[in-house]
Swiss-Prot record:
Short name of one Pfam family: UreE_N
SUPFAM superfamilies the UniProt entry points to: Urease metallochaperone UreE, C-terminal domain, Urease metallochaperone UreE, N-terminal domain
Name under which the protein is recorded: Urease accessory protein UreE
Statement: the UniProt record of this protein carries the keyword Cell division: no
Residue ranges of the region described as Disordered: 153-185
Keywords: Chaperone, Cytoplasm, Nickel, Nickel insertion
Length: 185
């Protein structure tokens, strides 16, 4: 980490998990400041935020695969610890009962380019009312909940997407990718 001035450190590395660093004795009595992030901000490489005490912090995480998670520690000194807080958000939770049902759910959600998260046997995605209603109509049994989203599957997350395309929209919510197929988002 480089310090431009005493107010604005530039965070370039994730030092570890808060609980693990406390267990190792690297964090003892230092005050812990939190940087609150929405789930989608944790995917960004360059970001400027403010801690819960008003300290400005800038992130430049350029190493491949560096993604911020809840309770990541990004700064430690004798006087201060800065840790990440991923804020809970509204989500859709699916609990497929079989492997084919899981595969179909992931396939259909992926076709809609929605970020997808797995937690045990649950499929989780950010809440979106049209998506929720579509999942209900498709025979899934979605539940609305509040969760911390962390680490989207790389195959379909915004920064992990491996291709680009242009597309157009009509006035009824349908979407065209230039390949002769229209679908609704």
């Amino acid at each position: 980490m480089k310090i431009i001035n005493p107010i604005l450190p530039i965070i370039e590395n994730i030092l570890g998990n808060l609980t693990a660093l406390q267990a190792e004795g690297k964090i003892t009595t230092q005050p812990i400041e939190r940087v609150a992030l929405q789930w989608y901000e944790s995917e960004r490489n360059i970001l400027r935020k403010t801690t819960n005490t008003g300290r400005e912090v800038a992130f430049r995480l350029l190493k491949e695969g560096q993604r911020l998670k809840h309770d990541d520690v990004v700064f430690i000194s004798d006087e201060l610890v800065i840790a990440i807080e991923i804020l809970p958000s509204d989500v859709i939770v699916l609990s497929p009962k079989t492997l084919p049902e899981m595969a179909r759910a992931c396939y259909e959600i992926g076709n809609k380019h929605s970020p997808l998260f797995l937690d045990g046997d649950e499929v989780i995605l950010p809440y979106d009312k049209p998506m929720f209603e579509w999942l209900q109509a498709a025979g899934f049994h979605p539940q609305k909940a509040e969760r911390r989203l962390s680490q989207a599957l790389r195959a379909n997350s915004a920064q992990g997407h491996g291709h680009s395309h242009s597309h157009s929209h009509d006035h009824h919510g349908y979407h065209h990718h230039g390949d002769g197929h229209w679908h609704k988002h």
